[in-house]
């Protein structure tokens, strides 16, 4: 199987014999749904390939769609002039970079349709784009299709410079203004991006812009469902399973755990990150692919400023008015986390109209916790290797939580004083972050018939039941586990169980006492 890793052009995938998961039925539906559409999805989720597929369709390239769903849906295969505006082709840390990109795009289409430039390197972008659209319509006798990929790339690059961002916004608003003026000459306008900016103020004059982002019927237009993966990549999963000494079902479960879990609407099925899953099948390894670039520092700092931690953002109830909102003035990290793909919809409650948000999968959870660990740890990732080795040797292999807690205490002892809060939940959040970073199967606040267990950690052979205390002692923690019979929730599980009581000193602000019972 040839995997289209890094390939975002539809004709190159088809002509090159690369694997393609058929999304063309949805492409056809989009093309006939409305004139002006907007879709946001996280990075590396197939937005550019979707744009390229739409371009091939509107250019009437029937040969590329042989054997695909759209071949039976489309009868006419009309050819339309297509203007493809790709804003991801550059970096926008200076205003001149934006001017260079826009001039380049316009010059190419002015040459194609023999439109004279108003003046050399003219920055009267609205008039130039309007002239191109009018000329394309006049010369072909067909309405024009405009495809705008990653419209918000300049806004993201300028996020830390308010003056530059305002300048960029004004330039883009002018550049795209002909999309309203030339409405009669337009057959279809499609805009993609990662996030919203002031309710798409850049396109504020565009008539009847339909937003597909949270519509159930388009939830699967980017990314792969498990059904699609099992149908397309059966042999690849078998090869992955053999390489990793798993059964087929175990391999599917492992891939699901690491890369599935995105939901983009109320009724969305689970969606796999396409970039991660094809890389994993190609490498036959469970690595971190999408998250390799890490979490922006400003986002981690904002989480700290707002008092949000891993426990809160991994199980957060919010209305869509909180997370599906503009992000250029970041006062709440939740919209950025959701729109960037760090959080996804886990559940929807119709009565309250609230969504439960959380990490979509293990790749994101582990990657995000690693970013927070860098913030917590005075040595950056210097302590990670030692903790990781201790975790797998002590906790996973030997069932020796006592030995691991000795290593963990050393880490806590070196915490910067300014990062330590005087409450039990803070230490619980940090401990959860550490275990998540280590790839542990860790569940915080697990409900029982008589309360909530602070944390439950499971390995193939062991179950660890944690109770954390602050300013008390480990015996008090163990007594609570026994009194409330937290262990009874796992009575039918044949794995060895351990009760783990940990106390954090209100004086030294580190682990000062622990007790491990069971085995």
Language-model features and meaning:
Residues 1-423:
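Phosphate-binding site recognition
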Residues 136-140, 434-460:
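Active-site metal-binding core of divalent-cation-utilizing nuclease and nuclease-like domains
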Residues 145, 462-464, 498:
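Structural motif
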Residues 165-170, 470-487:
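Mg2+/Mn2+-dependent nuclease catalytic core
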Residues 175-182, 335-343, 432-436, 440, ...:
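Metal-dependent nuclease catalytic cores in nucleic-acid-processing enzymes
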Residues 410-443:
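Acidic-basic catalytic patches of nuclease active cores, encompassing PD-(D/E)XK
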Residues 431, 455-470, 484:
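Conserved catalytic cores of phosphodiester-cleaving nucleases, focusing on short active-site segments
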Residues 489, 493-519:
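Domain-level recognition of nuclease-like catalytic cores that cleave nucleotide substrates
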């Amino acid at each position: 199987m040839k995997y289209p890793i890094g390939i975002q052009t539809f004709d190159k995938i088809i002509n090159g014999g690369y694997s393609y998961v058929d999304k063309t039925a949805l492409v056809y539906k989009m093309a006939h749904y409305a004139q002006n559409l907007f879709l946001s999805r996280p990075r590396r989720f197939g937005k550019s390939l979707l744009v390229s597929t739409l371009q091939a369709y509107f250019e009437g390239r029937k040969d590329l769609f042989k054997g695909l769903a759209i071949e039976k849906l489309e009868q006419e295969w009309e050819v339309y002039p297509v203007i493809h505006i790709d804003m991801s082709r550059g970096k926008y840390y200076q205003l001149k970079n934006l001017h260079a990109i826009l001039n380049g795009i316009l010059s190419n289409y002015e040459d194609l349709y023999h439109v004279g430039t108003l003046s050399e390197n003219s920055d009267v972008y609205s008039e130039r784009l309007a002239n191109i659209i009018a000329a394309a319509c006049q010369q072909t006798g067909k309405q024009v299709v405009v495809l705008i990929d990653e419209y918000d790339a300049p806004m993201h690059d300028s996020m830390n410079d308010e003056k530059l961002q305002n300048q960029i916004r004004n330039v883009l608003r002018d550049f795209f203004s002909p999309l309203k003026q030339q409405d009669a000459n337009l057959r279809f306008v499609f805009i993609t991006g990662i996030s919203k900016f002031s309710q798409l103020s850049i396109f504020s004059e565009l008539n009847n812009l339909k937003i597909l982002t949270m519509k159930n019927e388009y939830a699967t237009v980017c990314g792969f469902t498990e059904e699609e993966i099992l149908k397309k990549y059966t042999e690849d999963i078998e090869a992955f399973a053999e390489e990793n000494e798993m059964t087929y079902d175990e391999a599917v479960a492992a891939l699901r755990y690491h890369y599935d879990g995105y939901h983009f609407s109320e009724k969305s099925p689970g969606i796999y990150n396409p970039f991660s899953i094809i890389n994993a099948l190609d490498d036959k390894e469970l690595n971190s692919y999408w998250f390799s670039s890490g979490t922006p520092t400003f986002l981690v700092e904002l989480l700290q400023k707002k008092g949000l931690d891993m426990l809160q953002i991994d199980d957060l109830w919010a209305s869509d008015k909180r997370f599906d909102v503009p992000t250029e003035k970041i006062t709440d990290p939740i919209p950025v986390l959701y729109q960037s793909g760090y959080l996804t919809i886990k559940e929807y409650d119709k009565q309250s109209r609230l969504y439960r948000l959380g990490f979509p999968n293990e790749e994101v959870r582990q990657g995000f916790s690693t970013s927070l660990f860098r913030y917590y740890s005075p040595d950056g990732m210097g302590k990670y290797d030692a903790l990781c080795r201790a975790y797998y040797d002590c906790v996973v292999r030997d069932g020796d939580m006592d030995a691991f807690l000795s290593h963990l205490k050393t880490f806590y002892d070196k915490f910067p004083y300014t990062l330590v809060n005087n409450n039990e939940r803070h230490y619980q959040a940090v401990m959860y972050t550490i275990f998540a970073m280590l790839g542990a199967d860790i569940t915080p606040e697990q409900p029982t018939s008589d309360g909530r267990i602070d944390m439950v950690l499971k390995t193939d052979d062991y179950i660890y039941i944690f109770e954390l205390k602050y300013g008390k002692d480990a015996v008090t923690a163990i007594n609570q586990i026994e009194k409330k019979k937290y262990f009874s929730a796992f009575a039918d599980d044949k794995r060895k169980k351990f009760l783990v009581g940990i106390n954090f000193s209100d004086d030294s602000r580190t682990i000062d006492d622990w007790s491990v019972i069971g085995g």
